[in-house]
């Protein structure tokens, strides 16, 4: 059995994502960091960016956040975000709509053009792979 870590992403409007992941990559305020099961406990502030969720079948899901905090334990990652958009769906049109919502959310929260370009490239690349 694979070692999976539990992930929950919560905003003031409610739960955006809940599930298990093999790897979670978070946009920490000091840079991206990855979390696997058994990671040392920590609390980190998060900047606007993408949470990359690698599922047990090696597929990826993306959640765009504007900012927030992450609490990491050996078995669970809890993210409290000011705003978040899950970038996914069952059809190309749904994915495209959510991708635009995510881009709008991130644009509204960041003025760093290099960070924006990097975040948008990551989102576009993930959508092309699906």
From Swiss-Prot:
Coiled coil regions in record: none
Subcellular location: Cell inner membrane
Primary subcellular site in the record, as a coarse category: membrane
Keywords: ATP synthesis, Cell inner membrane, Cell membrane, CF(1), Hydrogen ion transport, Ion transport, Membrane, Transport
Highest taxon of the lineage: Bacteria
Function: Produces ATP from ADP in the presence of a proton gradient across the membrane.
Family: Belongs to the ATPase epsilon chain family.
Protein name per Swiss-Prot or TrEMBL: ATP synthase epsilon chain
Species in which this protein is naturally found: Campylobacter lari (strain RM2100 / D67 / ATCC BAA-1060)
């Amino acid at each position: 059995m694979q070692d999976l870590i539990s992930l929950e992403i919560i905003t003031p409007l409610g739960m955006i994502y809940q599930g298990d992941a093999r790897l979670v990559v978070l946009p920490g305020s000091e840079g991206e960091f990855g979390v696997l099961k058994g990671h040392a406990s920590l609390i980190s502030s998060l900047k606007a960016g993408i949470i990359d969720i690698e599922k047990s079948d090696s597929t990826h899901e993306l959640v765009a956040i504007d900012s927030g905090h992450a609490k990491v334990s050996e078995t669970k990652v809890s993210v409290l975000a000011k705003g978040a958009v899950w970038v996914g769906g069952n059809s190309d049109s749904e994915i495209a709509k959510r991708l635009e919502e995510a881009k709008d959310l991130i644009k509204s929260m960041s003025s760093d053009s290099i960070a924006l370009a990097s975040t948008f490239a990551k989102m576009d690349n993930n959508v092309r792979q699906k």
